[in-house]
From Swiss-Prot:
InterPro entries, A to Z: IsoCit/isopropylmalate_DH_CS (IPR019818), Isocitrate_DH_NAD (IPR004434), IsoPropMal-DH-like_dom (IPR024084)
Top EC class, one word: oxidoreductase
Compartments, as annotated in UniProt: Mitochondrion
Similarity field: Belongs to the isocitrate and isopropylmalate dehydrogenases family.
Organelle transit peptide: 1-113
Protein name, per record: Isocitrate dehydrogenase [NAD] regulatory subunit B, mitochondrial
Described purpose of this protein according to its UniProt entry: Performs an essential role in the oxidative function of the citric acid cycle.
Cofactor: binding details: Binds 1 Mg(2+) or Mn(2+) ion per subunit.
């Protein structure tokens, strides 16, 4: 069922770009840049494409076959800028190499300042807290903090890393968090920080969030120290609604959130900028150990693709895909990471079958 996509040949200066045409109808097609990425990326991206074909989503895919070991090309940046929307698999970052993370490179090049990760339990999956509803959203400042990439060796054996926090970036992410809460019927925003120790950097972030909170009196505002936040997430995650964080803390908290709802394969996410948005899994795990073995869980990227469809105004298609994914999980078709025995293709096939049986 995954082989039903029709290839469209277009002139290109790079053989790393492929174009696929999804379902064709009277509806104007939308073009989306796709980066399958490394590890399990190509498998879960293929899953999304197969599901979209079955759901008759009017999308044309512009695919860039790049790896985390390759530089980000200007052609890729131009594609995302032109299309304004991209779907991305995980990109591998070598731990001890001197090269910059390609994920960071994309965020900086496109000014993707907000990383949004909804963490919500899915019926049919055994989670860490079955007695309470886990349903919170992590909104992470995506361009500064410890991820500024400003590191240097001062002398052999001594290195320095600069943490950059600005009022402008803090205002932007805080306002985004409150606007997100307002638009999505959320009641509370919690700022996560370490201002008790990092009094200047995190102090500025917290002070700015506190200032912006005054513009939204209808939304409750709290703040919490990052170490206590991690403990409380494990202990009582139901107390959180929307969390706004500096860069590093958001990475940590969103991974905890993914674990709380069942694992890294279950959370979708988006990197949001003023001009472009990249949708991807909420937890960026390449999972090289299972790559190519038909064991990957495509749920996280499927849920990210649902977010993408809603952003594009394709709400009926979004509902169709989301309902199918949740129905298949509830019926017990699960991949091995969440206690099942289904392969990637079997899970994807079950989602496609559900869509085709319930097609209007």
């Amino acid at each position: 069922m995954l082989g039903r996509l029709r290839t469209v040949v277009k002139a290109s200066s790079s053989n790393s770009i492929r174009n696929y045409l999804g379902y064709t109808s009277g509806v104007q097609k939308k073009t989306v840049t796709v980066i399958p990425g490394d590890g399990i990326g190509p498998e879960i991206t293929s899953s999304v494409m197969g599901v979209f074909q079955a759901a008759k989503v009017p999308i044309e895919w512009e695919i860039f076959d790049i790896s985390g070991g390759q530089p980000i090309s200007q052609e890729l940046i131009a594609s995302i800028t032109r299309n304004k929307v991209a779907l991305k698999g995980p990109l591998y970052t070598e731990i001890l190499s001197g090269s910059q993370s390609r994920n960071m490179e994309l965020r900086k090049a496109l000014d993707l300042y907000a990383h949004v990760v909804p963490c919500k339990q899915i019926p049919g999956i055994t989670a860490r807290h079955d007695d309470v509803l886990v349903d919170f959203v992590v909104i992470r400042e995506n361009t500064q903090g410890e991820y500024s990439g400003l590191e240097q060796v001062l002398t052999p054996g001594v290195v320095q890393s600069l943490k950059i926090i600005t009022k402008e970036a803090s205002e932007r992410i805080a306002r985004y968090a409150f606007e997100y809460a307002k638009a999505n019927g959320r009641k509370k925003v919690t700022a996560v920080h370490k201002a008790n120790i990092q009094k200047q950097t995190d102090g500025l972030f917290l002070a700015t969030c506190t200032q912006i909170a005054k513009e939204y009196p209808e939304i409750k505002f709290e703040n919490t120290i990052i170490d206590n936040c991690c403990m409380q997430l494990v202990k009582s995650p139901e107390q959180y609604d929307v969390m706004v964080t500096p860069n590093l803390y958001g990475n940590i908290v969103s991974n905890i959130g993914a674990a709380l709802v069942g694992g890294p394969g279950l959370a979708g996410g988006a990197n949001v900028g003023e001009g472009s948005i990249i949708f991807e899994m909420g937890a960026h795990h390449v999972a090289a150990d299972i790559a190519g073995k038909d064991k990957a869980n495509p749920t996280g990227l499927l849920l990210a693709s649902v977010m993408m469809l809603k952003h594009l105004g394709l709400n009926e298609h979004a509902t169709k895909v989301e309902n199918a994914v949740k129905a298949v999980i509830k019926e017990g078709t699960l991949t091995s990471d969440i206690g099942g025995k289904s392969s990637t293709k079997q899970f994807t096939g079950a989602v496609i079958d559900y869509i085709e049986k319930n097609q209007n």
